[in-house]
Regions:
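A detector of single, family-specific signature residues
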Residues: 1-253
Protein backbone atom coordinates (compact mmCIF):
# COMPACT_ATOMS: atom_id res chain seq x y z
CA UNK A 1 0.00 0.00 0.00
CA UNK A 2 2.79 2.43 0.87
CA UNK A 3 4.60 1.66 -2.38
CA UNK A 4 1.43 2.70 -4.22
CA UNK A 5 1.09 5.80 -2.04
CA UNK A 6 -2.16 4.52 -0.54
CA UNK A 7 -2.54 6.26 2.80
CA UNK A 8 -6.32 6.00 3.23
CA UNK A 9 -7.86 2.63 4.03
CA UNK A 10 -11.48 1.65 4.64
CA UNK A 11 -12.20 -1.77 6.05
CA UNK A 12 -15.17 -3.69 7.38
CA UNK A 13 -15.13 -4.85 11.01
CA UNK A 14 -15.86 -8.55 10.55
CA UNK A 15 -15.51 -10.62 13.69
CA UNK A 16 -11.94 -10.49 14.99
CA UNK A 17 -10.36 -10.77 11.54
CA UNK A 18 -9.93 -7.02 11.05
CA UNK A 19 -7.79 -6.61 14.18
CA UNK A 20 -4.39 -7.93 12.93
CA UNK A 21 -4.75 -5.97 9.67
CA UNK A 22 -5.70 -2.82 11.58
CA UNK A 23 -2.74 -3.24 13.94
CA UNK A 24 -0.30 -3.51 11.02
CA UNK A 25 -1.68 -0.53 9.09
CA UNK A 26 -2.42 1.73 12.06
CA UNK A 27 0.93 3.54 12.20
CA UNK A 28 1.22 4.27 8.47
CA UNK A 29 -2.32 4.69 7.16
CA UNK A 30 -5.45 6.63 7.97
CA UNK A 31 -7.99 3.89 8.63
CA UNK A 32 -11.77 4.07 8.64
CA UNK A 33 -13.28 1.02 10.31
CA UNK A 34 -16.83 0.53 9.08
CA UNK A 35 -19.66 -1.35 10.74
CA UNK A 36 -20.92 -4.09 8.34
CA UNK A 37 -24.44 -2.72 8.72
CA UNK A 38 -23.47 0.52 6.98
CA UNK A 39 -21.47 -0.91 4.07
CA UNK A 40 -23.74 -3.79 3.15
CA UNK A 41 -23.86 -4.30 -0.61
CA UNK A 42 -27.06 -4.67 -2.59
CA UNK A 43 -28.42 -8.15 -3.07
CA UNK A 44 -26.83 -10.32 -5.70
CA UNK A 45 -23.81 -12.50 -6.17
CA UNK A 46 -21.38 -11.58 -3.44
CA UNK A 47 -17.63 -12.10 -3.65
CA UNK A 48 -14.78 -10.65 -1.61
CA UNK A 49 -13.61 -8.62 -4.61
CA UNK A 50 -17.07 -7.18 -5.24
CA UNK A 51 -17.49 -6.35 -1.56
CA UNK A 52 -14.09 -4.64 -1.49
CA UNK A 53 -14.95 -2.58 -4.59
CA UNK A 54 -18.31 -1.61 -3.10
CA UNK A 55 -16.70 -0.45 0.16
CA UNK A 56 -14.06 1.47 -1.82
CA UNK A 57 -16.76 3.24 -3.86
CA UNK A 58 -18.68 4.20 -0.73
CA UNK A 59 -15.50 5.45 0.92
CA UNK A 60 -14.47 7.41 -2.17
CA UNK A 61 -17.73 9.34 -2.03
CA UNK A 62 -17.43 9.94 1.73
CA UNK A 63 -20.43 7.75 2.52
CA UNK A 64 -18.81 5.63 5.24
CA UNK A 65 -19.14 6.58 8.90
CA UNK A 66 -16.12 5.28 10.78
CA UNK A 67 -16.45 3.41 14.05
CA UNK A 68 -14.91 4.84 17.21
CA UNK A 69 -11.42 3.41 17.55
CA UNK A 70 -9.29 4.39 20.58
CA UNK A 71 -5.46 4.17 20.58
CA UNK A 72 -3.75 0.78 20.73
CA UNK A 73 -2.98 0.89 24.46
CA UNK A 74 -6.61 1.69 25.28
CA UNK A 75 -7.73 -1.20 23.08
CA UNK A 76 -5.37 -3.52 24.94
CA UNK A 77 -6.74 -2.22 28.23
CA UNK A 78 -10.27 -2.86 27.00
CA UNK A 79 -9.40 -6.43 26.03
CA UNK A 80 -7.87 -7.14 29.45
CA UNK A 81 -10.76 -5.53 31.35
CA UNK A 82 -13.33 -7.54 29.42
CA UNK A 83 -11.38 -10.70 30.17
CA UNK A 84 -11.30 -9.72 33.85
CA UNK A 85 -15.09 -9.42 33.73
CA UNK A 86 -15.29 -12.92 32.24
CA UNK A 87 -13.15 -14.33 35.05
CA UNK A 88 -15.41 -12.61 37.58
CA UNK A 89 -18.43 -14.24 35.92
CA UNK A 90 -16.70 -17.64 36.07
CA UNK A 91 -16.09 -17.10 39.78
CA UNK A 92 -19.74 -16.21 40.34
CA UNK A 93 -20.79 -19.39 38.55
CA UNK A 94 -18.53 -21.49 40.75
CA UNK A 95 -19.91 -19.79 43.86
CA UNK A 96 -23.42 -20.74 42.77
CA UNK A 97 -22.34 -24.33 42.07
CA UNK A 98 -20.77 -24.62 45.50
CA UNK A 99 -23.90 -23.28 47.16
CA UNK A 100 -26.03 -25.76 45.18
CA UNK A 101 -23.82 -28.63 46.36
CA UNK A 102 -24.21 -27.51 49.96
CA UNK A 103 -27.98 -27.20 49.55
CA UNK A 104 -28.45 -30.73 48.17
CA UNK A 105 -26.22 -31.99 51.00
CA UNK A 106 -28.37 -30.17 53.60
CA UNK A 107 -25.42 -28.03 54.67
CA UNK A 108 -27.02 -24.68 55.49
CA UNK A 109 -23.96 -22.51 56.13
CA UNK A 110 -25.52 -19.74 54.04
CA UNK A 111 -28.25 -19.33 56.66
CA UNK A 112 -25.70 -18.46 59.35
CA UNK A 113 -22.77 -16.77 57.61
CA UNK A 114 -23.08 -13.82 55.24
CA UNK A 115 -20.55 -15.23 52.76
CA UNK A 116 -19.93 -18.94 52.21
CA UNK A 117 -16.59 -17.97 50.65
CA UNK A 118 -15.50 -16.07 53.76
CA UNK A 119 -12.60 -17.30 55.88
CA UNK A 120 -14.69 -18.95 58.60
CA UNK A 121 -17.08 -20.69 56.20
CA UNK A 122 -14.22 -21.95 54.03
CA UNK A 123 -12.31 -23.24 57.06
CA UNK A 124 -15.42 -25.17 58.16
CA UNK A 125 -15.97 -26.52 54.66
CA UNK A 126 -12.34 -27.64 54.35
CA UNK A 127 -12.69 -29.50 57.65
CA UNK A 128 -15.92 -31.10 56.46
CA UNK A 129 -14.30 -32.30 53.24
CA UNK A 130 -11.48 -34.01 55.16
CA UNK A 131 -14.08 -36.51 56.40
CA UNK A 132 -17.62 -35.77 55.16
CA UNK A 133 -19.09 -38.43 57.47
CA UNK A 134 -17.80 -36.70 60.60
CA UNK A 135 -19.51 -33.44 61.61
CA UNK A 136 -18.64 -33.66 65.31
CA UNK A 137 -15.35 -31.75 65.09
CA UNK A 138 -14.67 -28.66 67.20
CA UNK A 139 -15.90 -25.56 65.40
CA UNK A 140 -14.49 -22.89 67.70
CA UNK A 141 -10.88 -22.88 66.38
CA UNK A 142 -12.20 -22.52 62.82
CA UNK A 143 -14.35 -19.42 63.21
CA UNK A 144 -13.47 -15.78 63.73
CA UNK A 145 -14.68 -13.47 66.48
CA UNK A 146 -17.93 -12.33 64.93
CA UNK A 147 -19.12 -15.93 64.57
CA UNK A 148 -18.08 -17.21 68.02
CA UNK A 149 -21.53 -16.38 69.37
CA UNK A 150 -23.18 -18.41 66.59
CA UNK A 151 -21.53 -21.75 67.33
CA UNK A 152 -24.84 -23.54 68.11
CA UNK A 153 -26.35 -22.30 64.85
CA UNK A 154 -23.24 -23.36 62.93
CA UNK A 155 -23.39 -26.81 64.52
CA UNK A 156 -26.97 -27.23 63.29
CA UNK A 157 -26.07 -25.80 59.86
CA UNK A 158 -23.44 -28.47 59.14
CA UNK A 159 -25.61 -31.35 60.30
CA UNK A 160 -26.16 -32.73 56.81
CA UNK A 161 -24.97 -35.55 54.60
CA UNK A 162 -22.34 -35.04 51.90
CA UNK A 163 -22.11 -37.98 49.50
CA UNK A 164 -18.66 -38.96 48.20
CA UNK A 165 -19.67 -37.66 44.77
CA UNK A 166 -20.73 -34.27 46.13
CA UNK A 167 -17.56 -34.08 48.21
CA UNK A 168 -15.48 -34.70 45.10
CA UNK A 169 -17.42 -32.07 43.18
CA UNK A 170 -16.97 -29.54 45.99
CA UNK A 171 -13.21 -30.09 45.94
CA UNK A 172 -13.08 -29.48 42.19
CA UNK A 173 -15.20 -26.33 42.53
CA UNK A 174 -13.00 -24.95 45.30
CA UNK A 175 -9.80 -25.70 43.38
CA UNK A 176 -11.18 -24.05 40.25
CA UNK A 177 -12.35 -21.00 42.17
CA UNK A 178 -8.97 -20.57 43.85
CA UNK A 179 -7.23 -20.95 40.49
CA UNK A 180 -9.50 -18.29 38.99
CA UNK A 181 -8.70 -16.02 41.92
CA UNK A 182 -4.97 -16.40 41.28
CA UNK A 183 -5.27 -15.87 37.52
CA UNK A 184 -7.46 -12.82 38.09
CA UNK A 185 -4.85 -11.34 40.44
CA UNK A 186 -2.17 -11.83 37.77
CA UNK A 187 -4.40 -10.19 35.18
CA UNK A 188 -5.07 -7.24 37.46
CA UNK A 189 -1.33 -6.64 37.77
CA UNK A 190 -1.13 -6.37 33.97
CA UNK A 191 -4.11 -4.02 33.91
CA UNK A 192 -2.70 -1.72 36.60
CA UNK A 193 0.66 -1.54 34.80
CA UNK A 194 -1.03 -0.69 31.49
CA UNK A 195 -3.25 1.93 33.16
CA UNK A 196 -0.35 3.61 34.99
CA UNK A 197 0.01 6.48 32.43
CA UNK A 198 -3.63 7.47 33.04
CA UNK A 199 -3.45 8.22 36.77
CA UNK A 200 -4.68 11.80 36.31
CA UNK A 201 -7.71 10.71 34.29
CA UNK A 202 -8.47 7.94 36.78
CA UNK A 203 -8.30 10.39 39.68
CA UNK A 204 -10.78 12.70 37.93
CA UNK A 205 -13.16 9.81 37.26
CA UNK A 206 -13.04 8.72 40.89
CA UNK A 207 -14.36 12.10 42.00
CA UNK A 208 -17.72 11.12 40.47
CA UNK A 209 -20.28 9.59 42.85
CA UNK A 210 -20.25 5.80 42.79
CA UNK A 211 -16.83 5.43 41.16
CA UNK A 212 -14.51 4.35 43.98
CA UNK A 213 -12.66 1.32 42.70
CA UNK A 214 -9.60 1.73 40.50
CA UNK A 215 -10.93 -0.99 38.25
CA UNK A 216 -14.29 0.75 37.82
CA UNK A 217 -12.49 3.86 36.60
CA UNK A 218 -10.13 1.82 34.42
CA UNK A 219 -13.14 0.05 32.92
CA UNK A 220 -14.64 3.38 31.86
CA UNK A 221 -11.40 4.58 30.28
CA UNK A 222 -10.94 1.24 28.52
CA UNK A 223 -14.31 1.64 26.79
CA UNK A 224 -14.43 5.34 25.89
CA UNK A 225 -10.76 6.35 25.94
CA UNK A 226 -9.49 9.67 27.26
CA UNK A 227 -9.98 11.93 24.24
CA UNK A 228 -13.54 13.22 24.41
CA UNK A 229 -13.07 15.09 21.12
CA UNK A 230 -13.86 11.77 19.45
CA UNK A 231 -17.49 12.40 20.41
CA UNK A 232 -19.21 15.54 19.02
CA UNK A 233 -21.31 15.99 22.16
CA UNK A 234 -22.24 14.43 25.48
CA UNK A 235 -25.37 13.05 23.82
CA UNK A 236 -23.24 11.23 21.25
CA UNK A 237 -21.14 9.71 24.02
CA UNK A 238 -24.22 8.57 25.96
CA UNK A 239 -25.70 7.10 22.79
CA UNK A 240 -22.48 5.24 21.94
CA UNK A 241 -22.23 3.76 25.44
CA UNK A 242 -25.85 2.56 25.30
CA UNK A 243 -27.24 4.83 28.01
CA UNK A 244 -29.79 6.29 25.57
CA UNK A 245 -31.05 3.30 23.58
CA UNK A 246 -33.18 3.96 20.53
CA UNK A 247 -36.78 2.86 20.20
CA UNK A 248 -37.08 0.62 17.17
CA UNK A 249 -40.66 -0.48 17.82
CA UNK A 250 -43.58 0.92 15.85
CA UNK A 251 -45.79 3.60 17.42
CA UNK A 252 -43.41 4.02 20.34
CA UNK A 253 -44.45 0.71 21.91
Amino acid sequence: LLNRNCKDVCMESTGKYWIPVYNILENDCSIVLAHPKYVKAIRGKKTDKKDAKWIADLFKHDLVAGSFMPPADIRQLRDLMRYRFKLTCFQSSEKNRLQNCLTVSNIQLGNVVSDTFGKSAQAILDKLLENPADTSFDLEPLVYKSLKKKLPELRDAIDGYITPEQAGKLKVIKAHYESLESRKAELEELILALAAPYQQELAILQTAPGIRSDFTAIGIISEIGTNMEDFPSAKHLCSWTGFTPTNNESEGK
